[in-house]
Design a protein with these regions (language model features):
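A short, Trp-centered hydrophobic/proline-enriched beta-strand micro-motif
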Residues: 118-126
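A short core secondary-structure module
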Residues: 154-155, 159-203
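Short glycine/proline-enriched turns and hinge-like loops at secondary-structure junctions
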Residues: 65-66, 134-136, 167-171, 185-188, ...
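Short Gly/Pro-enriched turn/cap motifs at secondary-structure boundaries
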Residues: 88, 115, 130-133, 164-167, ...
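Flexible, small-/acidic-enriched active-site or ligand-binding loops
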Residues: 137, 197-228
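A structural signal for short hydrophobic beta-strand segments in well-ordered beta-sheet cores
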Residues: 140-143, 149
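Helix-loop "lid/cap" segments that line or gate small-molecule binding pockets
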Residues: 94-102
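Alpha-helical interface subdomain recognition
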Residues: 1-85, 102-107, 114-119, 135, ...
Length: 387
């Protein structure tokens, strides 16, 4: 079935993204996987190509294009190429909306140009060793101080530890979720922008993950970091609400990526099943394998229609948190099932990282964990049903 949600402009953009990936990412990705981190050069190249901050004002170097579908195209093509190293998805879809919604004019002047050019790589620090899905369990603290101090004015003294932070080694600016009022529950959570060279901000090791080896993921430590009050994003105490407002987009974006991974793994496996022979015939001709491929094709087609509808609803500002949770749950779990079946259909070759399906299997497993686990998605959906 032909997709109905894109225009010729989106199609042209897709061609450009594919060319960018072929030139700037694919030739280097294996080395990045060995290094455990990408080169900053790819971020600068993405900035020059107009792939960062597509929705932000052109005067800051953005694309001036608020259409979310351009990000859908970018994320789909990165997923299909197995380009897990450059975390443009995080930069554009998870951090960009916070900046666009919360930054003051002065903050825009300070951060937006570098954000769009790739000179300022961004991260967001929510998860702590003792607080994952339960954001109200955040223990990092930011205590407001008046005058004096190293920054010479009103500031927050930030203390705490974060973990599993994507872009953690490379990040120049980090949105830190911290508790500014210990007695106010979720109304005591605020967002602070921590910059690379602030004293007391240190990074732990680059974590050794099961997959996504080219993506730097780190622990971050904050010890009496003096963050200027001018680096508060939005209002003090407004952090939790801001986080909740962006979750539907984050979850649809993860679903978009997961479904694209599943589609590519299926396409690779279908081609392999037609050319790989056993017992005198292509392995896809065996009834069990044929049925397995038929099931995957159907499940992916159904998910594609559902996800494209959610993209359309999001673009119209009509996608609910419950519906976004459905997309995230369904697409990520489908991706897990599809990549696992595809590895099985490849036999021993599927277990080799030199085969794309093997990398997809390990790289994509986290999709049903980050951004809210499958179990949390079901909780959200259940509550939406009045249960």
């Amino acid at each position: 079935m032909r997709r109905q949600i894109f225009t010729e402009e989106h199609d042209a953009f897709r061609d450009m993204v594919r060319a960018f990936i072929a030139k700037e990412i694919t030739p280097y990705h294996e080395q990045w996987e060995r290094d455990g981190i990408v080169s900053r050069d790819v971020w600068l190249a993405a900035g020059r190509a107009g792939l960062l901050g597509i929705h932000l004002d052109e005067k800051y170097g953005g694309g001036g294009q608020p259409d979310y579908r351009f990000y859908v195209v970018l994320n789909e093509e990165l997923a299909r190429a197995g380009a897990t190293g450059p975390m443009f998805q995080l930069h554009n879809d998870m951090i960009g909306p916070y900046l666009d919604r919360l930054c003051s004019p002065g903050q825009r002047e300070r951060w937006f140009p570098g954000y769009c050019s790739g000179e300022l790589i961004s991260a967001i620090a929510m998860t702590e060793p003792g607080a994952g899905s339960d954001l109200q369990g955040i223990r990092a603290t930011a205590v407001r101080k008046k005058g004096g101090g190293e920054v010479g004015g009103d500031r927050y003294v930030l203390n705490g530890q974060k973990t599993f932070i994507s872009n953690g080694q490379l990040a120049d600016i980090v949105i830190v979720v911290a508790r500014t009022d210990p007695d106010a529950g979720h109304r005591g959570i605020s967002l602070l922008m921590v910059e690379r060279d602030m004293p007391g901000f240190t990074r732990g090791r680059n974590l050794d993950k099961l997959g996504m080896h080219a993506q730097d993921t780190s622990e971050l430590f904050f010890t009496d970091v003096e963050v200027p009050a001018a680096n508060l994003l939005g209002e003090e105490g407004g952090g939790f609400v801001a986080l909740m407002q962006n979750l539907p987009r984050e979850r649809v974006t993860i679903g978009v990526t997961a479904l694209a991974i599943a589609e590519q793994a299926f396409a690779d496996t279908l081609a392999y099943s037609k050319q790989r022979s056993a017992f005198g015939q292509p392995v896809g001709k065996f009834q069990h394998n044929r049925f397995t491929l038929a099931e995957m094709a159907t499940e992916i087609a159904v998910a594609r229609e559902f996800t494209d509808r959610a993209i359309t609803e999001h673009c119209a500002g009509q996608l609910s948190n419950d519906e976004a949770a459905m997309v995230k749950w369904w697409d990520t779990e489908l991706c897990n099932r599809v990549t696992d079946r595809c590895v099985q259909l490849h036999g021993g070759y599927g277990y080799m990282r030199e085969y794309a399906v093997g990398r997809a299997w390990t790289d994509s497993r986290v999709q049903s964990i980050f951004g809210g686990t499958t179990e949390i998605m079901k909780e959200i959906i259940g509550r939406g049903l009045g249960l």
